[in-house]
Amino acid sequence: MFIPVIMAGGSGSRLWPLSRSAFPKQFLSLDSSSQHTMLQATIERLQGLPIAEPIVISNEDHRFIVAEQIRRYGKKSRIILEPAGRNTAPAIALAAFTAIEQEDDPVLLVLAADHFVKNKSAFQAAISQAAQQAEAGKLATFGIVPTTPETGYGYIHRGEEVTQGTYEINSFVEKPQLNIAEQYLASGEYYWNSGCFMFKASVFLNELKQHSPEIYRQCELAMQGLSHDYDFIRVGVEEFLKCPDDSIDYAVMEHTKLGVVVSMDAGWSDVGSWSALWEVSDKDADGNVCQGDAILSGTSNCYIYAPNKLVAAVGLKDIVVVETKDAVLVADKNQVQEVKKIVEHLKAENRAEYREHRERYRPWGKSDAIDKGERYKVNRITVEPGKKQSLQMHYHRAEHWVVVSGTAKVTCEGNVKVITENQSLYIPIGTNHMIENPGKIPLELIEIQSGSYLNEDDVVRFEDK
């Protein structure tokens, strides 16, 4: 039995406008053949293997999204919250320390939450092969059999064969120029670096202590400040912030004598761009990938994503069109790496479209800002069963609530009232109020805010529950 360690950090900025800093690609459903998000799919493709409860590494901003997606998938997990991003070596170290505290030196399978794998059986076969190496005290990494001279991936140069499909590691190679990548592909001796690993927790920590002692030390100190908060595991903030920022490749794998690479040919992709997503998606006879409501005429090799509005495309070739509730991307499929520049521009201007979608997820449910104008704003709010918002008050706005479905238990200036479908309630300016869903189905209501100042910082509240 082994423990999956799922790294759920990262911003996925090249998949904007679908992926945003507050809701990046690992939490999206990008596979047209599945309803699972990428995080859920990462867990799903392990089904049938002898796995223990996963450890998921996330951050404060995404903690409720992680917890809710795993809950909806029907699994339990341990969620470690990093105080700040410090790359993969410290993150994996926290997971290894956590695993050793709770189990007797388990084998860890380290995976990214935002990868795509087409062939589940080939993926699991490679894991079984790597597990044998891990049990023998090796640090196994997965090398992806390359299909193109990709310049966006790092490479692993394999050495002598250890067993069939498993090799010693000669070297790790940075992202190459095209002519070098073509040589790598022709040689048959190089793999794409997947960034996924399998090893015993103790073996990894011993090698980390030897080759990157400062990372080991700061993570060990951070674990001494460990605390539990509902589903979450928090570590000492000050100690972790002193930890060097380094990848597992630089911190351990390039130095260890215990490394091996296991060959994997499973239709893997890190889905790092819209063109990469087009590559791995099912296509129609004209090479188009369509999700949502799209009508095409004379169009080929395009990616069309239209979940909210009808998108009509005429005479297009090699174009990406992505429609969301508050932004639309139109791009040449061969230049989609430049989307990152758009994201940088949005960030510099502090645009909301950089940070989050119009529909925003909260600890208690979600809120969709469906309309706004001079002195008013309209939200469609969903409160999950058993959840409630914090007790709060606003200085500049009043609120009108109309229940669409479900039952609301409202506390207003200490008075409790239950309202149901087609009933409404008025919350005056300066009134303490709280809404709760005591029922068994989601509570949906329309909230109309009115007043002279409608920004989110006009709120005095306790912590969301």
From Swiss-Prot:
Please give the Gene Ontology molecular function terms for this protein. GTP binding; mannose-1-phosphate guanylyltransferase (GTP) activity
Point out the coiled-coil segments of this chain: none
InterPro entries named among the record's database cross-references: GMPP_N, Man1P_GuaTrfase/Man6P_Isoase, Man6P_isomerase-2_C, ManC/GMP-like_b-helix, Mannose-6P_isomerase_type2, NTP_transferase_dom, Nucleotide-diphossugar_trans, RmlC-like_jellyroll
Q: Which Pfam family, just one, is annotated for this protein?
A: ManC_GMP_beta-helix
Enzyme class (EC, first level): transferase
Give the E.C. number(s): 2.7.7.13
Name the catalysed reactions: alpha-D-mannose 1-phosphate + GTP + H(+) = GDP-alpha-D-mannose + diphosphate
**Mind telling me which Gene3D superfamilies this protein's record contains?**
Jelly Rolls, Spore Coat Polysaccharide Biosynthesis Protein SpsA, Chain A
Task: Name the pathway it acts in.
Answer: Nucleotide-sugar biosynthesis; GDP-alpha-D-mannose biosynthesis; GDP-alpha-D-mannose from alpha-D-mannose 1-phosphate (GTP route): step 1/1; Bacterial outer membrane biogenesis; LPS O-antigen biosynthesis
GO BP terms in the entry = GDP-mannose biosynthetic process; O antigen biosynthetic process
Could you tell me which SUPFAM superfamilies the record lists for this protein?
Nucleotide-diphospho-sugar transferases (SSF53448), RmlC-like cupins (SSF51182)
* Superkingdom assignment: Bacteria
Tell me the keywords, alphabetical order. Answer: GTP-binding, Lipopolysaccharide biosynthesis, Nucleotide-binding, Nucleotidyltransferase, Transferase
User: Which family does this protein fall into?
Assistant: Belongs to the mannose-6-phosphate isomerase type 2 family.
| NCBIfam families named among the record's database cross-references | GMP_PMI
**What is this protein called in UniProt?**
Putative mannose-1-phosphate guanylyltransferase
Q: Which organism is it from?
A: Vibrio cholerae serotype O1 (strain ATCC 39315 / El Tor Inaba N16961)
Q: What is the lineage of its organism?
A: Bacteria, Pseudomonadati, Pseudomonadota, Gammaproteobacteria, Vibrionales
